[in-house]
Design a protein with these regions (language model features):
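Beta-strand segments within the central parallel beta-sheet cores of soluble alpha/beta enzyme folds
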Residues: 3-6, 109-112, 255
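Midchain, well-structured core segments that form catalytic/ion-binding scaffolds
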Residues: 16-228
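An extended, acidic, His-containing surface patch that forms the Zn2+-binding/catalytic region
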Residues: 166-210, 215-218, 232-237, 252-303
Length: 305
């Protein structure tokens, strides 16, 4: 039952299937609140952004060795409800290391695996890189430096972050250098986290993105992002920005699964009536909130404006 309920909430099948003209009323009250004493007056829309690229692998250089670096121990969390907490994104941390390893120690990227769900802040990521054998010790020093740095930067937010390295078998192929550099730059530049708070509800996130899943290896690269916003115009701005970022890296970018947000109206007459009625009934003011996740009301609002 719990799994079925979560599927229905996440996919909102009923609301997506609502046909225009089904409802006759002019005022819609949202009673969808998990906790008593709360009134929700807005929610985020979303869009799945997927960037893909195929390439022909090249062989590692003679005399190179392979090292697998693994980043784990992050808190992760829901990419809407907890995106405002500033939690670390494993993909965004790992790209900082990889970019420096390439620039300073002649490292080459063979593969990358990070994150597993679009709506979850990635907790783990790992990559296999090749490097001249004489640079291996310096690379291990960079791993330790980055582990200490990441823990210092996120000491007030994260549990201890683990960043380790181990020698692995040399892969048969790796990403060509020019494509590798473009991919790394795009991942590094990709917007992640909160873009803007709601001007009329300043303690609530309006627009955000989550660099959720990265898979690179065996001639294919795929990057999956979830963009959210209660403002449709800001959602379009964000997704266009993401598209531009990865298009410049030569990737094919697709937008799918989009749905509109429900922009809050703090001056709505029915909101004031609901607040007054609640206080009359229970003697306290209700908490008026906006959720940075999807609710059926955004879809109903589009169907029945």
């Amino acid at each position: 039952y719990r799994r079925q309920r979560q599927m229905c909430i996440r996919d909102r099948y009923g609301a997506f299937g609502l046909k225009p003209g089904t409802l006759n009323g002019e005022i819609l009250l949202n009673l969808d609140s998990e906790d008593e004493g709360e009134l929700y007056i807005g929610c985020a829309g979303g869009m799945d952004v997927t960037a893909t690229l195929e390439y022909k692998e090249v062989a590692p250089e003679e005399g190179d060795v392979a090292v697998k670096v693994t980043l784990k121990g992050l808190r992760g969390g829901h990419s809407g409800l907890e995106i405002n907490e500033g939690r670390a994104n494993a993909n965004k941390l790992l790209v900082r290391f990889v970019r420096e390893a390439v620039a300073s120690y002649e490292a080459r990227l063979a593969s990358w695996e990070g994150g597993n769900m679009r709506n979850a802040i990635p907790r783990e990521a790992h990559a296999v890189i090749t490097i001249p054998a004489e640079n291996e010790e310096e690379l291990l020093g960079l791993v330790k430096y980055c582990e200490d740095l990441f823990n210092e930067e996120y000491s007030a937010i994260e549990t201890p972050i683990s960043f380790t390295a181990e020698r692995v078998e040399l892969p048969a192929g790796q990403v060509p250098e020019e494509i590798q550099d473009n991919l790394i730059d795009a991942i590094f530049a990709c917007q992640n986290g909160v873009t803007r708070m709601i001007p009329t509800v300043p303690d609530t996130v309006e627009t955000s993105s989550n660099l959720a899943i990265i898979t690179i290896g065996e001639g294919k690269a795929a990057i999956k992002i979830l963009a959210r916003s209660s403002s449709d115009s800001m959602k379009e701005y964000l997704t266009t920005s993401l598209e531009s970022c990865f298009s410049m890296a030569g990737m094919k970018v697709e937008m799918t699964g989009g749905y509109s947000g429900w922009q809050p109206d703090v001056n709505s007459p029915i909101l004031h009536a609901m607040k007054a009625s609640y206080k009359q009934q229970f003697g306290v003011e209700p908490a008026v909130k906006v959720i940075h996740a999807g609710l059926e009301l955004s879809l109903i609002h589009i169907s029945e404006p």
